């Protein structure tokens, strides 16, 4: 494990780009390699064993690129695969759930926290467990939002359709008296302005992915593997199992990087199995 090696980020699609965007801000000297499994997205409705298998396939691909740290930038994959992968790999592995839960506990004033995520993340109760382990008296209300990821993956997150779907879905949370809402899926920050508008300015939104980059920074220092500024940095790399063109459009727009190039790869057997 060398300081000059890259940090790898994996996600079920383009959602993890919200984590990568924060990493570009907080860790400007680091080289980043991103892999989004867009062909098999969403992970939320899939059985846990299958999500674990897909997460391993992505991790193995990036390990061949000689990464020094792995960020599982996907809440569903973090919920079911983090502990297994962390125990098996010789490099630091970071998930997105614990940092988000910690931040929410710090921020809430009325002890009423909401969590929105995919069916897989919500069913796992990972956020609720993490929050209650820090503050047992906090009331946690969880809601799965199955239509949010497809909106983002189809590049419709700025559309009127997105506004309608978000408003209809979050209606169930509006009367719960929440003062804090965890965006428990890394796709959701792309919908942040719409979510904030629906929930109201009195509700603080927690971006679990952005919180995770703080932990990555801390681990780089702890293991003394931060990239030394004087060493030349190679370009960031982007891989997707889906359409490279669609990925490039969303990534360029979200990250503000012109001429961003992504490479299509195949994982496992049938890419849509």
Swiss-Prot record:
It catalyses: L-glutamate = D-glutamate. It comes from the Bacteria. GO terms for biological process: cell wall organization; peptidoglycan biosynthetic process; regulation of cell shape. Pfam families: Asp_Glu_race (PF01177). Substrate binds at residues 11-12, 43-44, 75-76, 186-187. Its EC number is 5.1.1.3. Pathway: Cell wall biogenesis; peptidoglycan biosynthesis. PROSITE patterns: ASP_GLU_RACEMASE_1, ASP_GLU_RACEMASE_2. Keywords: Cell shape, Cell wall biogenesis/degradation, Isomerase, Peptidoglycan synthesis. The active site is at 74 (proton donor/acceptor), 185 (proton donor/acceptor). One of its GO terms (molecular function) is glutamate racemase activity. Belongs to the aspartate/glutamate racemases family. Provides the (R)-glutamate required for cell wall biosynthesis. Homodimer. This is Glutamate racemase. It comes from Enterococcus faecalis (strain ATCC 700802 / V583). The gene is murI.
């Amino acid at each position: 494990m060398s300081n000059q090696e890259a940090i790898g980020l994996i996600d079920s699609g383009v959602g993890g780009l919200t984590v990568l965007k924060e990493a570009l801000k907080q860790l400007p000297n680091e080289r980043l390699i991103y892999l989004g499994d867009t062909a098999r997205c969403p992970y939320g409705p899939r059985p846990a064993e299958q999500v674990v298998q897909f997460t391993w396939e992505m991790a193995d691909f990036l390990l061949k690129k000689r990464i020094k740290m792995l960020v599982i930038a996907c809440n569903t994959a973090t919920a079911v695969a983090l502990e297994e992968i962390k125990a098996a790999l010789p490099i630091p592995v970071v998930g997105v759930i614990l940092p988000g839960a910690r931040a929410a506990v710090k921020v809430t004033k009325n002890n009423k926290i909401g969590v929105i995520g995919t069916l897989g993340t919500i069913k796992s109760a990972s956020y609720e467990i993490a929050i209650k382990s820090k503050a047992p008296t906090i009331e946690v209300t969880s809601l799965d939002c199955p239509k949010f990821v497809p909106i983002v993956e189809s590049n419709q997150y700025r559309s009127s359709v997105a506004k309608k779907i978000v408003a209809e879905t979050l209606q169930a949370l509006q009367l719960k008296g929440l003062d804090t809402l965890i965006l428990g899926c890394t796709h959701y920050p792309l919908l942040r302005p719409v979510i904030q508008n629906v929930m109201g300015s009195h509700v603080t939104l927690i971006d679990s992915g952005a919180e995770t980059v703080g932990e990555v920074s801390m681990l780089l220092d702890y293991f003394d593997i931060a990239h030394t500024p004087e060493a030349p940095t190679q370009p960031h790399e982007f891989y997707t199992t889906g359409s490279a063109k669609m990925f490039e459009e969303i990534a360029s727009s979200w990250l503000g990087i012109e001429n961003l190039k992504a490479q299509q790869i195949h994982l496992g057997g049938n890419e849509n199995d």
